[in-house]
Amino acid sequence: MASSHSLLFSSSFLSKPSSFTSSLRRFVYLPTRQFWPRQRHGFSTVFAVATEPAISSSGPKKAEPSTVVLPSNESSDKLLKIRHTCAHVMAMAVQKLFPDAKVTIGPWIDNGFYYDFDMEPLTDKDLKRIKKEMDRIISRNLPLLREEVSREEAKKRIMAINEPYKMEILDGIKEEPITVYHIGNEWWDLCAGPHVETTGKINKKAVELESVAGAYWRGDEKRQMLQRIYGTAWESEEQLKAYLHFKEEAKRRDHRRIGQDLDLFSIQDEAGGGLVFWHPKGAIVRNIIEESWKKMHVEHGYDLIYTPHVAKADLWKISGHLDFYRENMYDQMEIEDELYQLRPMNCPYHILLYQRKRQSYRDLPIRVAELGTVYRYELSGSLHGLFRVRGFTQDDAHIFCLEDQIKDEIRGVLDLTEEILSRFGFNKYEVNLSTRPEKSVGGDDIWEKATCALRDALDDKGWSYEVDEGGGAFYGPKIDLKIEDALGRKWQCSTIQVDFNLPQRFDITYVDTNSDKKRPIMIHRAVLGSLERFFGVLIEHYAGDFPLWLSPVQVRVLPVTDNQLEFCKEVSKKLRACGVRAELCHGERLPKLIRNAETQKIPLMAVVGPKEVETGTVTVRSRFGGELGTIPVDDLINKINIAVETRTAL
């Protein structure tokens, strides 16, 4: 068994950087440009990807490409060892080429490895040199040798090679002996393993250095900025090619690029990082999401509310945010000798609404829901498009209920979650139930009752789930749900959390049948997580090709020549009057107008030539179905309305 200090050097100790490929799932790439997720028992640790690119449906038919199953660190101990050893080999190569470079830490991560160095900024040319040196080290088949030394011996060796970061790491290790790994007799590092037996066990054709990024030592912006080199490593060259193919597809779907290309949203430097500007087309999609969300919540018995974006600092003291969440909050501001702060969460506001009057057991459950904008302090280096921002809108709701209502309320939340997510095309989930940690508030009975209620609700739903023993918050058990996108990636969106803490902090009560005051159960829940993040996931899930009912522009009206422009204006006006999101585009030759519409991912094009003007019709062309024929404008409106109502394509 590894000594406890080994945690300092294993990837499980290190916080893994977020990336668009950090939650890979299994998927199959078919030549129709569609990605169909495949799932077993609720979740999977490997995925399959084809090694050939997609082909045009109009081109010669080819056999479906064979799939390659890509293992994960969890499913393949061999792969984990390869990646960990690659981090060491890379560090050795860097110090051979750049003798002044100081090493820090280098773990394995989901898709490869990284190592942080204190050195001058690196270029792409430098990465190529480092990779060549790594290949030489691998080809030499050097042994990986484990050694145990005393603390004093470790200090002596570190001082001899002047590695200050390693000395800091060593100072944080409490137990002895200290473990060291050598590559041959030329290079060593503080490490507890595991590693492959020799560098020759690594397939150098299955290793690639991907990028360089800045990273603060220990994640502290006041400490030294380091150079972090990311690499990927696999068991075979075929696996590497499959992974790179997946990565290219993920890059094609990057919501930041698509958001700019389709004019959906932006981050304006003048306003500041992490603050989202929703453009008109993006705002249309957001409004559709919001209206669908509101309608379904009302149908499920929720009251919709709005609350302020700022509150007195005293409120955040009562809630505990100032004690436990202050580093994520913006600074206080003084107004007429009182301190105020932007809200990082909506929960205290909903409690204040509950407290506005005396509540009876007959009033429970009370369900309140809000699309509430919150603000959280994030370092600029952690911001990422719509996925990590400083101001975002949560689809927040809270339920106040009796103990014996917990199960039914949780089941209702699960039903609502399924209904909302399936509407937007997400039907596969990974579900986790997190139970009581060592330190917690609340008695044994209520913890047991709440946990059983969550478990029974999941069982009644028939969903597969994993139990994370001891993984709950100190104030209650929870259910986390990750949705699976078209590439099989998992995204954390939905959370259902029982809370025994805030009702106690705010001393909220209800009157029972004996007119005695009792403490209600509080359930926090979010289905989408945040509108910004969910929109980003939607963009990448559909690659910007939104279905007709969700597309910001459903029809683009195109004249063959400007002679048909007046009729096209009438068509556009009629479509919009009937609720169809239509726009007119002209001024170019028809082939270019069609190409532009396809580039902008417009689902339908209504082409108007002399015959269409004469007969009062339009010739409809679908991005997905080709020519749909020449039909009266009223028929097109009816077809679109039916397709939107049933959420189907034309």
From Swiss-Prot:
SMART domains: tRNA_SAD
Localisation per UniProt entry: Plastid, Chloroplast; Mitochondrion
UniProt cross-references to InterPro entries, sorted A to Z: aa-tRNA-synt_IIb, aa-tRNA-synth_II, aa-tRNA-synth_II/BPL/LPL, Anticodon-bd, Anticodon-bd_dom_sf, Thr-tRNA-ligase_IIa, Thr/Ala-tRNA-synth_IIc_edit, ThrRS_anticodon
Catalytic activity: tRNA(Thr) + L-threonine + ATP = L-threonyl-tRNA(Thr) + AMP + diphosphate + H(+)
Disruption of the gene: reported phenotype: Embryo defective. Developmental arrest of the embryo at the globular stage.
Gene Ontology biological process: embryo development ending in seed dormancy; threonyl-tRNA aminoacylation
Residues holding Zn(2+): 347, 398, 524
Keyword Ribosomal protein: no
UniProt keyword annotations, A-Z: Aminoacyl-tRNA synthetase, ATP-binding, Chloroplast, Ligase, Metal-binding, Mitochondrion, Nucleotide-binding, Plastid, Protein biosynthesis, Transit peptide, Zinc
Classification via SUPFAM superfamilies: Class II aaRS ABD-related, Class II aaRS and biotin synthetases, ThrRS/AlaRS common domain
Record EC number: 6.1.1.3
A GO MF label: threonine-tRNA ligase activity
GO cellular component annotations of the record: chloroplast; chloroplast stroma; mitochondrion
Source organism superkingdom: Eukaryota
Main location (coarse class): plastid
Family: Belongs to the class-II aminoacyl-tRNA synthetase family.
Cross-referenced PANTHER family: THREONINE--TRNA LIGASE, CHLOROPLASTIC_MITOCHONDRIAL 2, THREONINE-TRNA LIGASE
Name of protein: Threonine--tRNA ligase, chloroplastic/mitochondrial 2
Protein source organism: Arabidopsis thaliana
Native organism taxonomy: Eukaryota, Viridiplantae, Streptophyta, Embryophyta, Tracheophyta
Gene: EMB2761
